[in-house]
Each structure stands twice: as C-alpha cells, then as structure tokens.
C-alpha cells in the first residue's frame, strides 16, 4: 500500500496498518508503521514530516511509549478528514495517535490500553504480526 511504500524508503518496514472504521470500513484517518530499527524510524520522521501522502499533509513525530520495551521503532499516521490529523511514531512498540482523537497502541508482545477519541473506540497493537482494533465494549478483532 502507499503507506508501506512511502515509509520503506527510510528502512525495513515490519508492519504497516491503516485503521478502518468498524461500521463503514473506511479509513479513520490514521495508521501505524513499525520499523526494524530506531534509526529508520528517526529518518522517516525527518523525511516525512509535513509531506503529502494520499493527498493529505501529514505530521510525523514519535508517539509516547507506555512501558515499551527496547527494539525496533514504529508509529502511526493520521491524515484526518478536513486536513487534520497527526502522525505518531512508536519506539519499541509504544503507540500512536491521529485524527482529532488520541490513543495509545500496545507494544510488541502485549496490549497497552488506550482509546481513540470521538466514538469511544480503542486500538491496541500486539506482537509484530498482530494488532487489532475494536470499540470500548472489549470486542477486539484484527
């Protein structure tokens, strides 16, 4: 996908995921990218901040880790409807935020709680191949 292609320029991308709305299956305006190294993550932050992706200007930064472990960097981006959004980067599996909401993703090897504003949804990333999205009633799916 375009997210993977745009960021693979900066290093090995382990996973890229665009978060979809549960009801409409349309993009919620943000996603996550996980790199194999922190160096690749930092290069992508510098190279992509303020750039256009799929017709939207994105903001790129490192997201806050919640008890994250060491390891590869990653992140998420938000294009947002109406030009909003943010790009969250995670270091060692922290989390990301995007759109007008906020929220934290899980780290590698576990779930880190959090929510995405405006509708009570939550997003939790899992191990490298995992990750999931769901609403606040605790029903999660990949």
UniProtKB/Swiss-Prot annotation:
The keyword rRNA processing does not apply. SUPFAM superfamilies: RNA-binding domain, RBD. Residues 67-101 have a biased composition (Gly residues). InterPro entries: Nucleotide-bd_a/b_plait_sf, RBD_domain_sf, RRM_dom, SLIRP/GR-RBP-like. GO terms for molecular function: RNA binding. Residues 1-65 form the RRM domain. The keyword Aminoacyl-tRNA synthetase does not apply. It comes from the Eukaryota. Residues 48-101 are annotated as: Disordered. Possibly has a role in RNA transcription or processing during stress. PANTHER family: HETEROGENEOUS NUCLEAR RIBONUCLEOPROTEIN 87F-RELATED. This is Glycine-rich RNA-binding protein 1. It comes from Sorghum bicolor.
